[in-house]
Amino acid sequence: MRGGAAGPTAGEPPGTEAEAEEVEESSAGDDEELELGLSLGSKKQQQQQHAPCRILTARDLQPAAALSPDSSVSSSSPAAAAAAGGKRAEGPTATTSPGTVASGHPHSSFGVVGWPPIRQFRMNSLFNQAKENTSETDTKKTATNESDVQKDKEEGEKKGRVAGWVKVNMDGEVIGRKVDLNAHRSYKTLALALELMFTKPSIGLCASHNTNSLKLLDNSAEYQLTYEDRDGDWMLVGDVPWEMFVSSVKRLRIMRTSDANGLGQRYQGIHRTIASTRGRS
């Protein structure tokens, strides 16, 4: 019978119908939960899409910048990424604040110079040190040059080469001459040079220069060569070594032999007096 189809059949056990009803109810409940979950998920997505965007400030990004100063602002904060996705126009305003850049690179104000990188204050200190070393080297060179000049001067004084140019006068001549003693190395060359300066036919000297130069140094000619020393005394040329003569001469004079002989006699008398005084003592 059709009316008895809802009930248990003769061949089926009595619990089969109850189990079928429970399966139908559980499937219906699962469908309702699935629909409810889908509806809730769509509502959450709608709420997230319609959520208002907020502009980030330096306070929001400061902790992230302190943790990783080399990382960019967009990667250090997830909220910044969400805001950048929502509004592109407002993103650069929040990420380019001066406080953020200063907090991300605290040592950028010192500056880096050259390669390998050297900070500015270190470069200045190295430059000042090099400048001081250069000035010290120049001072040492100047002191060395001054000491060398002083040594050369002292050596020249010791060698007797400080006389240089001296005046030469001749009896009977109004105008005098000058001669460089450093250009000569002996009395002979000096006498020859002076004879060539003052030679005249009236002097009565021989024509030979060698003979004239020798006669100026002895008492056989009309004129005799004398000099004034540092003490102001007039002396005959040729009595002392050449180096001593050059170091002590002040000026030269070609004196007449008569006057020069008196000078020589006086000089010899002084030496005799000194020798006798030493013998008595």
Swiss-Prot record:
<feature type="short sequence motif" description="EAR-like (transcriptional repression)">
    <location>
        <begin position="36"/>
        <end position="40"/>
    </location>
</feature>
<dbReference type="InterPro" id="IPR003311">
    <property type="entry name" value="AUX_IAA"/>
</dbReference>
<dbReference type="InterPro" id="IPR053793">
    <property type="entry name" value="PB1-like"/>
</dbReference>
<keyword id="KW-0804">Transcription</keyword>
<feature type="region of interest" description="Disordered">
    <location>
        <begin position="130"/>
        <end position="157"/>
    </location>
</feature>
<feature type="compositionally biased region" description="Basic and acidic residues">
    <location>
        <begin position="133"/>
        <end position="157"/>
    </location>
</feature>
<dbReference type="InterPro" id="IPR033389">
    <property type="entry name" value="AUX/IAA_dom"/>
</dbReference>
<protein>
    <recommendedName>
        <fullName>Auxin-responsive protein IAA10</fullName>
    </recommendedName>
</protein>
<keyword id="KW-0927">Auxin signaling pathway</keyword>
<dbReference type="GO" id="GO:0005634">
    <property type="term" value="C:nucleus"/>
</dbReference>
<feature type="compositionally biased region" description="Low complexity">
    <location>
        <begin position="7"/>
        <end position="17"/>
    </location>
</feature>
<keyword id="KW-0539">Nucleus</keyword>
<comment type="similarity">
    <text>Belongs to the Aux/IAA family.</text>
</comment>
<feature type="region of interest" description="Disordered">
    <location>
        <begin position="1"/>
        <end position="115"/>
    </location>
</feature>
<comment type="subunit">
    <text>Homodimers and heterodimers.</text>
</comment>
<keyword id="KW-0805">Transcription regulation</keyword>
<dbReference type="GO" id="GO:0009734">
    <property type="term" value="P:auxin-activated signaling pathway"/>
</dbReference>
<keyword id="KW-0678">Repressor</keyword>
<feature type="domain" description="PB1">
    <location>
        <begin position="163"/>
        <end position="259"/>
    </location>
</feature>
<feature type="compositionally biased region" description="Acidic residues">
    <location>
        <begin position="18"/>
        <end position="35"/>
    </location>
</feature>
<feature type="compositionally biased region" description="Low complexity">
    <location>
        <begin position="63"/>
        <end position="84"/>
    </location>
</feature>
<dbReference type="Pfam" id="PF02309">
    <property type="entry name" value="AUX_IAA"/>
</dbReference>
<dbReference type="GO" id="GO:0006355">
    <property type="term" value="P:regulation of DNA-templated transcription"/>
</dbReference>
<feature type="compositionally biased region" description="Low complexity">
    <location>
        <begin position="36"/>
        <end position="49"/>
    </location>
</feature>
<comment type="function">
    <text>Aux/IAA proteins are short-lived transcriptional factors that function as repressors of early auxin response genes at low auxin concentrations.</text>
</comment>
